[in-house]
Regions:
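Proteins enriched for Cys/Gly/acidic motifs involved in redox and nucleic-acid/cofactor modification
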Residues: 1-16, 73, 96-106, 130, ...
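Conserved SAM/AdoMet-binding glycine-rich loop
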Residues: 3-129, 137-138
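Short acidic/polar active-site loop segments enriched in Thr and Asp
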Residues: 4, 43, 142, 147, ...
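Short, glycine-/Ser/Thr-/acidic-enriched flexible segments
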Residues: 13, 52, 119-120, 151, ...
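Short beta-alpha junctions and helix-cap segments that line functional grooves
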Residues: 59-60, 132, 242-244
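Hydrophobic, well-ordered secondary-structure elements that form the walls
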Residues: 75, 116, 136, 144, ...
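Terminal RNA-binding accessory module
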Residues: 160-292
Length: 292
């Protein structure tokens, strides 16, 4: 039907098929999806909500080897303190999660990792929070979200929260959330600036025309579009603003050079717009003068 992108979403995509007796598992599903996309020509499949539990080497090798599986994983870790991981009944401890994160980066070149954490879970101490904060600064996730724990009736956590000694005050939750997001902001903004400084080239999937922000070249406003590189999932991650001299269409894949950054977002120009027609040998290229 002309779709270019497929986002796999579920409560736990890592363990896909186990509840319905499908022996293919996630590896088999990814392989079949990759082959289907290949038969249709182009596109990418993005893995979301992949729990770290049971994420084994075969899955890592499969993602690394398949051309149409985006080198992007959304893997909710929830915390990095053993105390909290045990209370949350996550089934893994910090060392296991940490080893998996570094193994993913080592064995899948160019992999973008997104994760989510919960702050203020009943019983979370300041030491638990500091362990998480330190890991966020150390590992430097490509994308990250933080959620404040909220009460859900009928859950074990809700029972824990009934104990005043375990309940985390709302103002403490807010402070911890802010500290985590500021740490991630520093990482994300630096990454965006680096890609702009290097003039990195990516294929950008165009989503829609951008009407709120404009990019100018020599004081002339260029038509601007919202798009995403492979490392940007829809709705939850940053975007790439593409300023083009030519009209672009949603669903179009455009090779672009990153020429600027606006906090989390990237600013790009189509490579074809930046090329100069000349019969002389030229080394390097020009990115034009762009501002947002």
């Amino acid at each position: 039907d002309g779709a270019f992108e497929l986002n796999m979403i579920g409560q736990d995509t890592t363990n896909w098929g186990r509840d319905i007796g499908d022996d293919r598992g996630l590896v088999g599903l990814l392989t079949e999806l990759n082959n289907t996309v290949a038969r249709h020509g182009s596109g990418w499949v993005r893995l979301m909500y992949a729990y770290p539990t049971n994420f084994d080497d075969e899955m890592i090798d499969t993602i690394a080897s398949l051309d149409h599986i985006a080198k992007y994983i959304d893997i909710p870790l929830q915390h990095m303190s053993d105390n909290m991981l045990t209370a949350m009944r996550r089934g893994l401890l910090r060392k296991e999660q940490e080893d998996l994160m570094y193994r993913l980066r080592e064995r899948i070149p160019g992999l973008a990792i997104r994760t989510t954490f919960i702050t203020g879970f009943p019983g979370e101490t300041e030491d638990d929070h500091q362990q998480l904060l330190e890991f966020v600064r150390e590992f430097q996730f490509d994308m990250m979200g933080v959620f404040k724990y909220s009460h859900e009736d009928g859950t074990v956590a809700a029972t824990m929260e009934d104990d005043p000694k375990l309940r985390v005050p709302e103002e403490v939750k807010e402070r911890r959330e802010e500290e985590l997001m500021l740490a991630q902001q520093e990482v994300a903004w630096a990454n965006a600036d680096y890609l702009a400084e290097e003039g990195a080239v990516f294929d950008v999937l165009i989503d829609e025309r951008e009407h709120q922000r404009e990019v100018t070249e020599e004081d002339v406003a260029l038509p601007t579009y919202q798009g995403r590189c492979y490392h940007q999932a829809p709705e939850v991650d940053s975007i790439t603003l593409v300023a083009s001299k030519h009209e672009l269409a949603p669903g179009e894949l455009v090779r672009c050079r990153i020429v600027g950054a606006a906090e989390y977002d990237l600013i790009a120009r189509p490579v074809s717009d930046l090329e100069r027609s000349t019969s002389l040998p030229v080394l390097g290229g020009s990115s034009g003068g762009c501002s947002a």
